Amino acid sequence: MSFVKEFREFAMRGNVVDMAVGVIIGGAFGKIVSSLVGDVVMPVLGILTGGVDFKDLSIVLKEAAGEVPAVTLNYGAFIQTVFDFVIIAFAIFLMIKALNKLKREEPKVEEPAEPKLSNEEVLLTEIRDLLKK
């Protein structure tokens, strides 16, 4: 089997394609949530906390010296990232909960079909019925 053919079979399996689609959608979803947090949630939270811009929150560890920039601990950006994570984790939790609920629904139970009798069994049944008469 050629390398290309093996790779094509691997790539076209359902699980690999599903995973690739999930990664692409997840990346896009992450960008949407980051925008939601950075452009909507954090400004509102900043207004509620007295006009604080979370992007600018930092602690200066070492002052700037000449052309060397200051060393800062940017905890405001960290707070934004934590909000991103919480929203994404909550959305994933809701999706997994919905999928588990769908999986838990009881599958339809197939009633067993009556076994098909072989030719010998059919003949023996007919003979038995004739002898009963």
Curated annotation (Swiss-Prot):
Spans through the membrane: 10-30, 76-96
Record's protein name: Large-conductance mechanosensitive channel
UniProtKB keywords: Cell inner membrane, Cell membrane, Ion channel, Ion transport, Membrane, Transmembrane, Transmembrane helix, Transport
SUPFAM superfamilies (alphabetical): Gated mechanosensitive channel
Keyword Cell inner membrane among record annotations: yes
Record bears the keyword Membrane: yes
Organism: Pasteurella multocida (strain Pm70)
Family under the similarity heading: Belongs to the MscL family.
Chief location of this protein within or outside the cell: membrane
Coiled-coil ranges (or none): none
Bilayer disposition of the protein: Multi-pass membrane protein
InterPro entries: Mechanosensitive_channel_CS, MS_channel, MSC/AndL, MscL_channel
Encoding gene, per UniProt annotation: mscL
One cellular-component annotation, GO: plasma membrane
Biological function: Channel that opens in response to stretch forces in the membrane lipid bilayer. May participate in the regulation of osmotic pressure changes within the cell.
